[in-house]
A protein has these predicted regions:
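Winged-helix/helix-turn-helix nucleic-acid-interaction surface
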Residues: 62-101
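Key DNA-contact positions within bacterial/archaeal DNA-binding proteins
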Residues: 59
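Short recognition helix of helix-turn-helix/winged-helix DNA-binding domains
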Residues: 1-53, 82
């Protein structure tokens, strides 16, 4: 069973869906977080597969990934320009709480 940090449900959902008006970004984040937890490593997935998994268009998946990278909620690496990206889910709220705590 996938376990989510309380922040993901209590704050991040409201922030991405309500404030940013980017519900697809939230769905993509959830999918990547769950897959990263299952695999215990960054997730390698194409835009097409990501879009199909979430149930949106490929362009919506691309926009969601770009927004999540902009918000520093995921990071992306590639072996080369045409390679399938590897996405690592980030939890910046944990780093912030450690600095202030």
């Amino acid at each position: 069973m996938v376990k989510l940090d309380e922040y993901v449900l209590d704050s991040l959902m409201r922030d991405l869906v309500g404030h940013d008006r980017r519900p697809v970004s939230y769905l993509v984040y959830l999918l990547l977080a769950a897959e990263q937890q299952r695999q215990n490593k960054p997730v390698s997935i194409s835009y097409s597969d990501l879009a199909e998994s979430v149930g949106v268009s490929k362009s919506s998946a691309q926009s969601a990934v770009a927004w999540l990278i902009h918000r520093k909620l995921i990071s992306s690496t590639k072996a080369n320009v045409t390679a399938t990206p590897n996405y690592a889910v980030q939890t910046p709220w944990k780093a912030n709480s450690q600095r202030t705590g």
